[in-house]
């Protein structure tokens, strides 16, 4: 027998899959990006100043959000994030952009419009394993 019972997602007071305005989606991505940095930092994926995570901007498809150069992953807040265009110009934010982050992530986002986010890190364990020159 078919029932018209609402699904678990439909019963959730805030449906995370509900359509959002582009502005709300921007804030959502920035919040999740800041959380991702904190998680990466807590797990030890922020060795030195190397490493970056980006999220495509839903309002401007030629831009992405990225961490500022030299800031610990463990300290990054939404207000610290930089909006960078595909020419390397900081559109929003007052920190310097990591040029390596721009070089890597601008190419990923340009080549793969279906990709919303990308991460690159230099974890202690990753560097140790790579020094062994063994395939995964």
For the regions a language model picked out, list residue spans one by one:
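Glycine-rich flexible loops
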Residues: 2-136
